Amino acid sequence: MSGPDHVQCPVCAKTVTMNDINPHLDSHYSDSSGPSKPVSPFFKKERYKHHLETNVSSHQSATKFIEPEPSPTKKTKLTRRDTRPLAERARPKSLDEYVGQEELVGERGIIRNLIEQDRCNSMILWGSAGTGKTTLARLIAVTTKSRFIEISATSTTVADCRKIFEDSQNYLTLTGRKTIIFLDEVHRFNRAQQDIFLPMVEKGLVTLIGATTENPSFRLNSALISRCPVFVLKKLTRDNVKKILNHACLLESERLGSSMPNVETSIIDYISAITDGDARMALNALEMSIGMLRQGPLSLEDIKDKLVRSSALYDRVGDVHYDTISAFHKSVRGSDVDATLYYLGRMLESGEDPLYVARRMVRIASEDIGIADNSMLPLASSTFTAVQQVGMPEADVILAHCAVALALAPKSVDVYRSYNAVKSFLSSHPDAGRAEIPMHIRNAPTNLMKQLGYHKGYKYNPDYKDGLVMQEYLPDSIKGTKFYKLPIELKEDEEIKNLKTDTK
C-alpha cells in the first residue's frame, strides 16, 4: 500500500518513495526491453491538448486523458490520417472559438470569469444534445492546465471511479495540480453511485464536471447539486449552427484539398434549420453530405432525401416532425396499435424528444379517450413523469406501454367537442363572456354580500334526494344553451358500407 510518502509507479505498479519516483520512472524509459504499451500520462508535464483513450483499470472503462500535441514536422501527416468524425475534428481549441452560450463563456460570461480567476470548481452542465457540454468541459481543462479525465456513466463502474480518485490524489500530491473529471450522462448513475463523488468534491480533491440532458432536479442527488452549481446551456441558434458548419467546411477543405466538393449555402441553411440547435447532428449531416457530393453533383432535394432516408437527420422543427406526430396521434385515435408503435419507434429512434411525445399522449388521453376511460389520463400523466425521471433509452418501453394502452382504449370525444362548442359560443357572442351570474350561486363570504342577496335561495344539492333540485345555473341571457353532447350526424365510412354490401 502507498502511504503519505509513497506512491505507486504507473508503469510497474511498484510502491516507491516520493523522492525516488522520478529516477524510478527514468529507469523504465531507458530500458529498451520495457513495456510495449504507452506509459500512462500520469506524471507528464503540462503539454497536453488533445485526448487519448486509455484504461484506468482492468475494467477497461472508457477514460480519456490529455495527450501531447504533435510536433510541426508530423502535423501534416497526422491531418491526412485523421479518421475522427467531423464533429470531433471541428471542436474549438479555445474559449474564443467556442460558439454560443454567451452568458457562460462570452466576454462577461460567468464560467469564463471563473476560469480567468482560477476559481473553476465542480459544476453540472445541463443542456440538450449538441449544445457544447463536452467541448466546454475540455476547454476548461485546457485553459486551466488541469489533468483531464473523461468518463461516461453508461460504461464506468464504481470501482473505476475509486481507481480514478486514487490516481487523482497521487497526482495532486506529486504535482499540486487537481484533476478534472468530466462525467458525461451523469444522470445515468443511480443515487448511490452519485454519492461516491461527494467526499472528493467536498474536499476539493477533484473537480467534477457533470453533463446531463435531463433535469437535474429530478435525476441528481440534492447533496450533489448543492456542491455543484448547475449551469444551463441553451439550445444553439440557427446562426450559431451556421457558423459551426461554415468553420467545419473550411477544415474539410484543408483536409481534402482539391477533392473537397462545393457545399452550397442552401445545404448549410437547410441543415442548420432542421437540426434544432444540435451541433453534433448538424456536423454529422454535413459530413454525410460532403461524402455524397464527392461522388457527384446533387441537388438540395437529393441531399434532403438521402439524409432523411439514412436517419442521419430527423426534422424536429419542420414538416417531418409535425407529420410524424400527427400520424402517431391519428393512429391512436383510430385504435391501430401497429401503426401507433411504428410511428412511436420512428420518432424515438430518429432522435425525437421523448417528453414531446409524452406531452402529446397526455393530450390524447383527454381529447380522444376522455370519459370513455378516465384511467387513461392518470396513466399518461404518470408516463410523462416516468420519462422525466428515467430518461432515454430506458423510457422507450414506458412510452410504448402508454401508447398501446391509449390505442386499445375505448374512445370518446364528447368532452373535446363540448369544450370546443363553449369556445366557439364565447367567440361568436362577446357579451356572453360578461353575462351576469345568477345571485343564488354567487359566493357570499361577507355579511354585506349576504345582505345584498348573494347566495340567497341556493339549494345545496346533497341535502336533497338524489341531489335533484329545480335550480338554474346559467346566466339568464343564455338560459337553455346546450354545449355537452350536441346532436351530431355521424357518417358511415363508404368502404365499410361497401364491404358490408359485398358480404351479403
From Swiss-Prot:
It holds the Pfam family AAA_assoc_2. Keywords: ATP-binding, DNA damage, DNA repair, DNA replication, Hydrolase, Metal-binding, Nucleotide-binding, Nucleus, Zinc, Zinc-finger. The keyword Hydrolase applies. It is found in: Nucleus. SUPFAM superfamilies: P-loop containing nucleoside triphosphate hydrolases, post-AAA+ oligomerization domain-like. PANTHER family: ATPASE WRNIP1 (PTHR13779:SF7), WERNER HELICASE-INTERACTING PROTEIN 1 FAMILY MEMBER (PTHR13779). Functions as a modulator for initiation or reinitiation events during DNA polymerase delta-mediated DNA synthesis. Has an intrinsic ATPase activity that functions as a sensor of DNA damage or of arrested replication forks and regulates the extent of DNA synthesis. This is ATPase WRNIP1 homolog C26H5.02c.
